[in-house]
């Protein structure tokens, strides 16, 4: 099963009483992101919903409903899954990480070199946990809450 396959429940009530590990991987990723991001407010500009960065020409605002924010998150995460689809079963984990840090920090560009994680995966080496946890910094400082998030992502999504 493709871990990036989005499964939409008939209602949010259907998911409420289930263990997170009984949920499909995509739903686990959504829940994890929502838990750590929370709904953004005007102080979080240019981010809305659950961490969507407003792009030029987009007209999102902070009055969006939780359902609209959820839909936007799922759309963004699916787009990132497509970007990392060549990494197969690791595509959802990479998409989830890039949702927060941006895909260029993994894929590389003029400012960043290709991440060690992707270099290892390209060679078939899936021993990426320690490299994944290195993405626990903000403004050059190690942030314990970000490390907890990374550990949670690994536990929920690394197969």
Residue ranges and their predicted role:
Residues 92-105:
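Short N-proximal segments of mature Sec-exported proteins
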Residues 41-44, 84-93:
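Surface-exposed patches in mature extracellular/periplasmic domains of secreted proteins
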């Amino acid at each position: 099963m493709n871990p990036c396959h989005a499964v939409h429940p008939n209602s949010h009530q259907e998911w409420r009483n289930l263990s997170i590990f009984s949920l499909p991987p995509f739903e686990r990723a959504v829940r994890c992101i929502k838990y750590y991001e929370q709904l953004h407010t005007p102080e979080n500009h240019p981010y809305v919903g659950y961490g969507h960065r407003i792009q030029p020409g987009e007209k999102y605002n902070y009055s969006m409903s939780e359902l609209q924010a959820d839909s936007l998150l799922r759309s963004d995460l699916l787009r990132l899954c497509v970007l990392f689809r060549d990494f197969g079963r690791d595509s959802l984990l990479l998409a989830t990480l890039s949702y927060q840090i941006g895909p260029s920090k993994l894929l590389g560009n003029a400012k960043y070199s290709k991440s060690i994680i992707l270099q290892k995966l390209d060679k078939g080496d899936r021993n990426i946990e320690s490299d994944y946890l290195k993405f626990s910094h903000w403004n050059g400082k190690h942030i314990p809450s970000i490390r907890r998030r990374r550990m949670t992502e690994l536990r929920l999504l690394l197969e």
